Amino acid sequence: LARLADKNDLGDKIHFLGALNEQQMKQAFLDCNVFVLPSTIENSPNSLGEAMLLGVPCVAADVGGVSNMLHPGQGYVYQSTAPYMLAHYITEVFRQQERAEEMGAQARLQAMETHNPEKNMRDLLEIYRVIAEEQ
């Protein structure tokens, strides 16, 4: 990737961070303007959930469970076979920074609900209770 960036005269605009510890990764998320998930194959990407939890504006390909995680008004989801939409949405984040920040805040609220340990524990216990009653 670094060679490709250099070949396209982007070497001074793209920073490859290498391996990061937990705190460094959190800071990298907080320092960025946009989180981009251009994957063509995903399930339920942890990196998207982490970006959402930190309120980072997100642009993600509509693959796997992405659209179940990132809802309208919380970020941009684009068709994975349409890279021009990826470019468009990244541009929108920079053009409409206030809107992007609001979407990041909405994504954070969604992620806080989805990843709430107490709620998840209650829901799981209820599932087990129902299963036990059916036995």
Feature names for model-found ranges:
Residues 26, 45-53, 67-68:
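Short alpha-helical segment that forms part of, or immediately flanks, the ligand-binding pocket
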Residues 57-60:
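Short hydrophobic beta-strand element within catalytic cores of glycosyltransferases
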